[in-house]
Amino acid sequence: MKIEIRPAFDEAVMAAEVPVRKAAAKMLVLLQSLDLPDLWKHPGLNFEKLHGMIEPTTGRQLYSLRVTGSSRAIACLLNGPTLVLVSLHVQHYKAYRR
């Protein structure tokens, strides 16, 4: 799968503590080895649709991926498929605020 990283995601990863940075790097390697059906089925990533949440730049549906037990990446899917990593939230409950 092709991965696109937005600046906000990259900045959040760089500002995060070392365990989150390592987990994000591990997640990126894993994502590159998956195709879309595998992404939906992967139990560790817990890829799920965020109902009612749309990426403002593209108008695409937003999804959540588990980075660590408490950290979530917010992403959208483009044609291809390309997974766009939009943001990273170290406290996962903040990822779901509108």
Briefly describe each language-model feature range.
Residues M1-D35:
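Arg/Lys-rich, positively charged N-terminal/basic patches that mediate binding to nucleic acids
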Residues P7, P43-L45, G69:
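A general secondary-structure junction signal
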Residues E11, K22, R60-R98:
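Enriched for short, Lys/Arg-rich terminal
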Residues E17-V18, E48, R97:
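Amphipathic alpha-helical interaction segments
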Residues R21, L36-W40, Q91:
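Residue-level signal for secondary-structure boundary elements
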Residues A24-L30, N46, P81-V84:
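Terminal low-complexity, poorly structured segments
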Residues L34-L65:
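A short, surface-exposed loop/turn module that caps and links secondary-structure elements
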